[in-house]
């Protein structure tokens, strides 16, 4: 069994308002090993993305990580200063966002942006950095990488922009990549290509992956293990085949049963009864 890379214990993230603190993430425990792909699954509002942002220290006011440990390679990230976290982000831990335009500056050429991701963390000649950028674009399947380094983001399709975002995340060979629904807005064909590339890259470099999604089909295809989130908590986790083939928690069963593939043609789609609790309904003693 591979070494533990990320060990999260009792993570709680709250958003402060005049009425008090409201828990978006409420006691999350999560372990990720080197080279492992973990799917973090749940419906909108379950706390998936807030968990991902919390791990990287990217929660802005009025949000705050109020409790828990986030141990990366044995070091508690919550005890690091902002400069130490800045050196970690994009270097040892990278993140890929749902919208690649959150990663890419529209007025800078792709090559400039990619080279900056290297030069921020390493003192290498610019020509060497650009060669690594070219190789990264080639790795994610972008044709004519030399030409594309001189292109602007608007000259790429949505799928190609997402490939660029993946290439940027891989530039410094991080130990962990957090992916926040990076294929949600893409068509099925492009989604399949990107999933294949991500699996290939992770296996080659022994990179661990946290794949945040609401799509159980993607998790079944991509992940080694899955953690199911509901109302800010992980309610079930385990090897992906075990959880999807024999779910033990009612919410996990409800998610699986509501998939179109589980419904006969012409039959009414099944849905989970009731509604997920709001922040106010699940408010606890978070401070």
Where do the PLM segments sit?
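Short catalytic/signature loops enriched in Gly
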Residues: 2-4, 143-147, 239-287
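Conserved ABC ATPase "signature" region
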Residues: 76, 128-147, 256-257
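P-loop NTP-binding/switch modules centered on Walker-like glycine-rich loops
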Residues: 43, 178, 186, 190-268
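A short, proline-enriched helix->beta-strand linker immediately N-terminal to the Walker B motif
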Residues: 171-175
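Conserved ABC ATPase signature
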Residues: 151-156, 160
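Conserved ABC transporter NBD signature motif
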Residues: 65-76
